[in-house]
C-alpha cells in the first residue's frame, strides 16, 4: 500500500526556475512512469483518467526518488467503479477522478486490472461482451489462464493499492509552474486543437475556444 504525499509545497516558493524542466530526465534519471495510449485496444475517451492517474503514478515515483519498480495504477478501475461520478469512455473530469479515488479510499495497482479501454456505456463492439460494473473482480482479480483456454478469474480482497492524502486545484501558469517543479506532474484539461502545431514553451492561444 502506498500513500501519496501532501499536495502542499515541500519547498519555499521561488520566482526563479530553470528555463526547462523535464521530470523524465533529471540528471539522467527518469522520474516518470510508462507512456500510455487511451485508444488501445480500441477507442475510449478516457484522456481525463489517463492524465489524472499518470500524474499520480509519477508523483509516487518522484516521492520514492525513482527507487524500486515503478508503481502504475489501474485506470480501468476508475472506468469500472467511477463511471457515475468521474466519467467513462465517453469523457469525464480529471478532478473528479481524484475526488473518486479519495472518497473510495484507494486505487489498485494495474497488476490487479489491465486497461481494456471499455466502460459499461461504451459503444465499441469489443466492449459489449463483458460486464464493466463495479464488482469485486472488476477491482482486482487473478486468472488461472487466458479465457479462450478456459481460464477462470476470481477477485482478490487484499490487493496492492495507493491512496491520496489530499488533492486540490492549481490555477494560473505561475502556480502550475511552481507545483510541477516542486511536487511533480499535474493533470489539467485543455483544448487539444492548439497542440497540433505546438513546438514548445508556454501554450498560449488566446483566440482558441476555452471549452474542453
Annotate each PLM feature.
Residues 1-212:
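Catalytic-core signature of thiol
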Amino acid at each position: 500500500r502506498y500513500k501519496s504525499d501532501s499536495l502542499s509545497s515541500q519547498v519555499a516558493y521561488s520566482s526563479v526556475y530553470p528555463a526547462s524542466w523535464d521530470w523524465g530526465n533529471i540528471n539522467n534519471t527518469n522520474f516518470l512512469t510508462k507512456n500510455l495510449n487511451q485508444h488501445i485496444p480500441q477507442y475510449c475517451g478516457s484522456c481525463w483518467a489517463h492524465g489524472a492517474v499518470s500524474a499520480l503514478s509519477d508523483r509516487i515515483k518522484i516521492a520514492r526518488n525513482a527507487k524500486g519498480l515503478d508503481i502504475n495504477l489501474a485506470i480501468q478501475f476508475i472506468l469500472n467503479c467511477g463511471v457515475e461520478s468521474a466519467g467513462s469512455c465517453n469523457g469525464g473530469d480529471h478532478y473528479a477522478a481524484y475526488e473518486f479515488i479519495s472518497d473510495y479510499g484507494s486505487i489498485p495497482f494495474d497488476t490487479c486490472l489491465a486497461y481494456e479501454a471499455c466502460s459499461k456505456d461504451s459503444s465499441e463492439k469489443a466492449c459489449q461482451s463483458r460486464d464493466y460494473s463495479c464488482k469485486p473482480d472488476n477491482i482486482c482479480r487473478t486468472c488461472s489462464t487466458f479465457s479462450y483456454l478456459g481460464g477462470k478469474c476470481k477477485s482478490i480482497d487484499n490487493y496492492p493499492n495507493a491512496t491520496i492524502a489530499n488533492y486540490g486545484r492549481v490555477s494560473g501558469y505561475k502556480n502550475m509552474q511552481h507545483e510541477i517543479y516542486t511536487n511533480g506532474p499535474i493533470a489539467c484539461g485543455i483544448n487539444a486543437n492548439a497542440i497540433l502545431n505546438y513546438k514548445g514553451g508556454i501554450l498560449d492561444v488566446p483566440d482558441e475556444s476555452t471549452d474542453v
